[in-house]
C-alpha cells in the first residue's frame, strides 16, 4: 500500500524528450557503463521499484489496472504504481537498455536476464513483518529469488561470466516508508516492542544487514534511496485532517535517512562496498515547497480521483488529471514519473561520478 521513495524514467518510447543537460549526463553514463562492463541492474524494495512482481502474488497490493501505466509504453498497466516508468527503468534507459522487468514476469527472456531484474514487491520494507502484514515479499524473500536468478544466469552464460556480470552490476534498494506507514504506526506489534527512536534504530540494523547480505551475494556497487517526506503524502494529510505536511512523520523519515547515510559510510569504509545515497526526501520536499521551479502546478493532491485518498485499488478506473507532468503525486501516495525523473537526474550524476571512475 503506502510507499514511495525515490526515482524513475528516461528516454522511453512515448515519453517527452528529456532536457539537454540530462541528455549529457545520460551520454556520459552510457560511455562509462560500457567502459566498466556494467550491463545489469538488480533491484530490491517496495512499490517505488516494483515493476509488477505483485501481479503474481496473492495480495491486494497491485497496480496492474488503469489508470496506472497510462503514460507507460503503449499506455499499458504493468503493475507499476505510477503513471509511467519507475526509477530502475529510467536508469536502464540511460544505459541504453529496455525497462527493468519483474523477475516473476512469465514473458521474461534470456536477454532480459542478462540486463538484470527487479525482485521488489510493493508493500515491502526492511522489517520482514511489514511484508507479512500485506502478504508480499519481504527483503529476505526477494534475496532468495535473487539466488534463483543467479542459478538461471549461470546456466545461461556460465559460472565465470555470471559472477563477473553480478560483480559489475548496479544493485539498488528502495524501501522504508511502509515500515512506518503500514507497520509501526498502525500495527501494535512493534509499538509494544519499540519506541519510535528504537524502531528507527532497529530498521537501521536491518538495512545494514540487508546491504551486507547483497555484498555477500556479489554486490560491489549499491544505490540506496532514502525515505521520502511521508508527512507530505496526500493520503497522510487527508487521514490527519490537515492541508499542510505532517511534521512528525517527516521528522521520522529525516531521522531514518540519517541512519541510512551513516550505514552507507560504514559499508564503504569497512567492507569496500561502493555506495550512493539518493536523497528523495529533499528533492520531493523542495518540489512541494517550490513546485513552479520544477514545472509543477499541483503539489498537494494526487492526479488520480480526488487526489486525497485514492491509491492502489481505490484508484482503479478513476478519472485522472489532464496532465500528470504538472503533478508531484500520481495517486495519494506515489509520485508521478515526472517527479521521479527529477530525482533520478541527480542519481545518474552520482552513479557516473562515484561508481564509474
Curated annotation (Swiss-Prot):
GO terms for molecular function: hydrolase activity, acting on ester bonds. GO terms for biological process: lipid catabolic process. InterPro entries: GDSL, GDSL_lipolytic_enzyme, SGNH_hydro_sf, SGNH_plant_lipase-like. Its EC number is 3.1.1.-. The keyword Flavoprotein does not apply. It comes from the Eukaryota. It is found in: Secreted. Its main location: secreted. Residues 1-23 form the signal peptide. The active site is at residues 47, 331, 334. CDD domains: SGNH_plant_lipase_like. Keywords: Glycoprotein, Hydrolase, Lipid degradation, Lipid metabolism, Secreted, Signal. Glycans are attached at residues 37, 132. One of its GO terms (cellular component) is extracellular region. Belongs to the 'GDSL' lipolytic enzyme family. This is GDSL esterase/lipase At5g45950. The lineage of its organism: Eukaryota, Viridiplantae, Streptophyta, Embryophyta, Tracheophyta.
Amino acid at each position: 500500500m503506502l510507499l514511495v521513495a525515490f526515482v524513475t524514467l528516461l528516454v522511453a518510447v512515448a515519453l517527452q524528450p528529456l532536457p539537454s543537460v540530462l541528455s549529457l549526463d545520460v551520454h556520459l553514463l552510457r560511455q562509462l557503463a560500457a567502459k566498466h562492463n556494467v550491463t545489469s541492474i538488480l533491484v530490491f524494495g517496495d512499490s517505488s521499484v516494483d515493476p509488477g512482481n505483485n501481479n503474481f502474488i496473492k495480495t491486494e497490493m497491485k497496480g496492474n489496472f488503469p489508470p496506472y501505466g497510462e503514460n507507460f509504453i503503449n499506455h499499458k498497466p504493468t503493475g507499476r504504481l505510477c503513471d509511467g516508468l519507475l526509477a530502475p527503468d529510467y536508469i536502464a534507459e540511460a544505459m541504453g537498455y529496455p525497462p527493468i522487468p519483474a523477475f516473476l514476469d512469465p514473458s521474461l527472456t534470456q536477454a532480459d536476464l542478462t540486463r538484470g531484474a527487479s525482485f521488489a514487491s510493493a508493500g515491502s520494507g526492511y522489517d520482514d513483518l511489514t511484508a507479512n502484514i500485506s502478504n508480499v515479499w519481504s527483503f529476505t524473500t526477494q534475496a532468495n529469488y535473487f539466488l534463483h536468478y543467479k542459478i538461471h544466469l549461470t546456466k545461461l552464460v556460465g559460472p565465470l561470466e555470471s559472477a563477473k556480470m553480478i560483480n559489475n552490476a548496479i544493485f539498488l534498494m528502495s524501501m522504508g516508508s511502509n515500515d512506518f506507514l503500514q507497520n509501526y504506526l498502525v500495527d501494535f506489534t512493534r509499538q509494544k516492542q519499540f519506541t519510535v527512536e528504537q524502531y528507527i534504530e532497529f530498521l537501521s540494523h536491518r538495512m545494514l544487514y540487508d546491504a551486507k547480505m547483497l555484498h555477500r551475494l556479489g554486490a560491489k556497487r549499491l544505490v540506496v534511496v532514502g525515505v521520502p517526506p511521508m508527512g507530505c503524502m496526500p493520503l497522510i494529510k487527508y487521514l490527519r485532517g490537515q492541508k499542510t505536511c505532517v511534521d512528525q512523520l517527516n521528522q521520522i523519515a529525516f531521522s531514518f535517512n540519517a541512519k541510512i547515510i551513516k550505514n552507507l559510510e560504514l559499508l564503504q569504509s569497512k567492507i569496500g562496498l561502493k555506495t550512493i545515497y539518493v536523497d528523495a526526501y529533499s528533492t520531493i520536499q523542495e518540489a512541494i515547497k517550490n513546485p513552479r521551479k520544477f514545472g509543477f502546478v499541483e503539489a498537494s493532491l494526487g492526479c488520480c480521483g480526488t487526489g486525497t485518498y485514492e491509491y492502489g485499488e481505490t484508484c482503479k478506473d478513476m478519472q485522472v488529471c489532464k496532465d500528470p507532468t504538472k503533478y508531484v503525486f500520481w495517486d495519494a501516495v506515489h509520485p508521478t514519473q515526472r517527479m521521479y525523473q527529477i530525482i533520478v537526474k541527480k542519481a545518474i550524476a552520482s552513479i557516473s561520478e562515484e561508481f564509474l571512475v
